[in-house]
Amino acid sequence: MTSAVSFPITSQASDMLSKFYGSDLGSLYGTLAEKYSGGKPELAEKLRDYACKGWFGYSSPILTSVTGSGLPISCFLLYVPDTIEGLVDHTSELRWLSVMGGGVAGHWDDVRGPSAKSCGTIPFLHTVDADMSAYWQGKVRRGSYAAYMSISHPDLIEFITMRTPTGDVNRKNLNLHHGVNITDTFMRCVERGENWDLVDPKSGAVAHTVSARELWERILETRFRTGEPYLNFIDTANRGLHPALKRKGLKIRGSNLCNEIHLPTAADRTAVCCLSSVNLERYDEWRETDLVECLVEMLDNVIQTFVDEAPLKTPHTARAVRSAAGERSIGLGAMGWARYLQKHRIPFDSEEAVRLTGIIFRGIKSAAVRATRALAKERGEAPDLTGYGVRNAHLLAVAPNANSALLLGTSPSVEPEIGAAYVHRTRVGSHQAVNPYLKRDLESLGLDTEEVWDSIVSNKGSVQHIAALPDSLKKVYKTSFEMDQRVIVRQAAERQRHLCQGQSLNLFFPIGADKTNLSDVHRLAWKSGCKGLYYLRTCAGRTGHKIFEAKKNPEKTEECTACQG
């Protein structure tokens, strides 16, 4: 089953297809529709048609699963036990899951701190750091791992700075990502200026007592310098856990590689999530259709494929298969949000955008719940969900989805764009990116010239310097660094009300940002109900390269490094 896509394919998307998928997009979509239709011709036809219209995108693991080289799973979340046997087993499991193509996260809260009989967590994390260079994701790119640790762990202070390049190289973990599980109690201590105890999870003894505010400031300083650690508001996440899973005594102990998955882990349970994303840029085209229902069914079929095929590849998937079969959680997300707003000339950091994101995601949630209830009637409830009338414990999670967005020629995820014109660097090389809606508006004003575009790139993708551009359009095309980050957080909080999992939420601050404002924005994310914060991006203030010169002389193209996180 093949068909031509009805949206333009960029040169960058074409290069990615050629290098990683060896197929034209229409043929690839046809193959995927057949594979994940569950044997239903009508669903296969709809999936093919909706994909070719650019209404949604598959995650990279699902795209590559047609080659048979890996599993269609994006995320694996592993509990790390406090025993030598458990630590060795964790290493073995993460290696195999990485080779199977998934990103891996480890939840380290329960591993004891350093003592006369224990070296603590950092040396064990160092072995994981080495593994990521050796055990490649899907055998095509270096492995990816995120470690999560409690805000009260004795190793926390060293953990926070383990990705900074100075210090003992044997205790640095530059190949890993990391996140801190932050509790409500800690945040209240920060607000009140109280002390905070770092407590050994094994003995219960207080290892250190520190100022909560100073620890908070240290975390933010490290985020500002390196982009990490992620912040994972663990109590908020656990409040959103499905009640059936709570009744089983399960709890969330961390997030995933991209901080949007919030599922329970345990010694016998490795959380799994498969992903797909609707394209909000084309929301007006699909809003009255059954797109969301079709994608929920498709992702449930992906889960079943994993349950059926994973044990045949390695026995080290047993915990993941148990979790996937038991709760059948999926992660339907979104991309193209910035482009949708630009299409309709709505500023990203506006009250109207906050209102619209609530309306749109309320509708997506309602459709997803209808779909999982229908699947429960047709196929049965998941074993962990008996009596709740649903097939899938969790349904919605907004991932970064940069590669999926690239294939569809839209903006990634639900975040603002870094600029209206820039050099976009991905795993297939560097390409020039020009905002099509700004081009539309510049054409209408007689400003679509090489000189204007060169000035935009020279000003880090900004249009604020263009005198002939009306203020109303300058607001629409603000870069992510020109926006009020508090409005971005408020918008994310409105969206979070309708997400059973989370969202990869980035923040953007210029070099020299006010420390008080930085802290206030992060605290607002916690107070307003966001489950976590992903990267903190900083703008280094360098100018871009002449985009049209790069087009004429591709051999001289340089990569834009203006914005670093």
Swiss-Prot record:
The record marks C560, C563 as: Interacts with thioredoxin/glutaredoxin. One of its GO terms (molecular function) is ribonucleoside-diphosphate reductase activity, thioredoxin disulfide as acceptor. Substrate binds at S60, S74, C75, G103, N256, L257, C258, N259, E260, P400, N401, A402, N403, S404. Pfam families: Ribonuc_red_lgC (PF02867). SUPFAM superfamilies: PFL-like glycyl radical enzymes. Its EC number is 1.17.4.1. It is an enzyme of class 1 (oxidoreductase). It catalyses: a 2'-deoxyribonucleoside 5'-diphosphate + [thioredoxin]-disulfide + H2O = a ribonucleoside 5'-diphosphate + [thioredoxin]-dithiol. The record marks D82, R112 as: Allosteric effector binding. It comes from the Viruses. Keywords: Deoxyribonucleotide synthesis, Disulfide bond, Oxidoreductase. The active site is at N256, C258, E260. The record marks Y534, Y535 as: Important for electron transfer. Disulfide bonds join C75-C273. Under complex allosteric control mediated by deoxynucleoside triphosphates and ATP binding. The type of nucleotide bound at the specificity site determines substrate preference. It seems probable that ATP makes the enzyme reduce CDP and UDP, dGTP favors ADP reduction and dTTP favors GDP reduction. The record marks C75, C273 as: Important for hydrogen atom transfer. GO terms for biological process: deoxyribonucleotide biosynthetic process. The keyword Nucleotide-binding does not apply. InterPro entries: RNR_lg_C, Rrm1. Heterotetramer composed of a homodimer of the large subunit (R1) and a homodimer of the small subunit (R2). Larger multisubunit protein complex are also active, composed of (R1)n(R2)n. Belongs to the ribonucleoside diphosphate reductase large chain family. Ribonucleoside-diphosphate reductase holoenzyme provides the precursors necessary for viral DNA synthesis. Allows virus growth in non-dividing cells. Catalyzes the biosynthesis of deoxyribonucleotides from the corresponding ribonucleotides. This is Putative ribonucleoside-diphosphate reductase large subunit.
